[in-house]
């Protein structure tokens, strides 16, 4: 689940794996106290989302023009689905909510608890995210 969450913000599976490893390392080294399993799960999801956003921001700062990039041999990765690519193209506040709702099966109330947001805010982000997703997918078809 955490890997899928990291993948919604990152285009590289290796970066997503690194993020999840860093989150578990932080869990082991800081040893935070949790009230129950739900609290621990919420902490893991929130920390994964924050770390993935940090990595995505850092990647944007160190991007290299395509002409200057060196081509390295490697394994071919399967193309992500057009819908997943569109979800990843959304701003973080929308993609996180959409991913948790549709891919992880959380309710709006559960997402609000996980992200520490008011329930109406989550509903609004879900609605606006769907609309932006429609626009992105419509542009891809045209």
Name every feature range the model reports, one short phrase each:
Residues 3-22, 32-38, 119, 141-142:
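Short, charged helix-capping/linker segments at alpha-helix termini
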Residues 97-101:
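A short pre-motif secondary-structure segment
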Residues 29, 35, 46-67, 76, ...:
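Arg/Lys-rich amphipathic alpha helix in sigma70-family domain 2
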Residues 2, 6, 16-27, 47, ...:
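Short, small-hydrophobic-rich alpha-helical interface motif
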Residues 3, 24, 91, 95, ...:
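C-terminal flanking helix
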Residues 82-91:
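Short amphipathic alpha-helical boundary/capping segments
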Residues 49, 53, 115-139:
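DNA-recognition helix of helix-turn-helix
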